[in-house]
Amino acid sequence: MRALIKLFANFWLVARVYWSNYKNAGNIVDYDVKDDLDLSTVSKLAKYIDKSYSKFTYTYDGPDELFDSMRFPAQCYYDQFIKGSLRDDCDGFHSSAYHIATKYGYDAYILTYMTSNLIDSHTVLAIRKNNSWYKIDYGRLTTGKTIDDLIKGKNVIAYNLVKFNYKQKRWYIVEG
């Protein structure tokens, strides 16, 4: 049974990227962020992201949306900071955070990991800087030398790292 769940998890992690690109074609692809913030360290970025949680309403995927697509980063940022409220789940919140991080020059990724029970699967912001990895999960900061350090203890059966290509207007898989 575990092998079947792992097979599904790996398939879904790949298919989700393609589905996200298809479903979000035509959405806002780029949007300027406030450039007067001091986000010069990963910890300052994490604190800013934590404060931005007040402009976010967590909404569970409905039965017809379970394991749904990731919206494009600029669209999530626009909803959260320009319209004033982002209604989404973990991938939408961290997609908005990804947009901020990339605009401030960070080597940012969206890290999605699938757990053996599937219910605890999650999406977070990952940043690589100075041979270290940082995970920002709703503003909570974790550090490690590898991606495995960031997800240990989570009973992970599969994960992937994705980036958004602003010129090609699509998510792409970097690892996983």
PLM-predicted stretches and their roles:
Residues 1-176:
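A structural boundary/capping signal
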